[in-house]
């Protein structure tokens, strides 16, 4: 699980990225 890749991908942000990085959008 790479942060950079998920950060760019909406799917990663909504699933796991959300916990690590709360999207401002």
From Swiss-Prot:
Q: A single Gene Ontology molecular function, please? A: hormone activity
Keywords, A to Z, come to: Amidation, Hormone, Secreted
Output the SMART domains linked to this UniProt entry: NMU
What Pfam families is this protein classified in? NMU
Q: Name one GO cellular component term.
A: extracellular region
Q: Does the keyword Secreted apply?
A: yes
Question: Which residue positions does Asparagine amide occur at?
Answer: 25
UniProt-annotated location(s): Secreted
Major localization listed first in the record, in broad terms = secreted
Q: Which family does it belong to?
A: Belongs to the NmU family.
Q: What does this protein do?
A: Stimulates uterine smooth muscle contraction and causes selective vasoconstriction.
Question: What's the protein here called?
Answer: Neuromedin-U-25
Which organism was this protein described from?
A: Gallus gallus
């Amino acid at each position: 699980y790479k942060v950079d890749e998920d950060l760019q991908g909406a799917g990663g942000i909504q699933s796991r990225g959300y916990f690590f990085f709360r999207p401002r959008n």
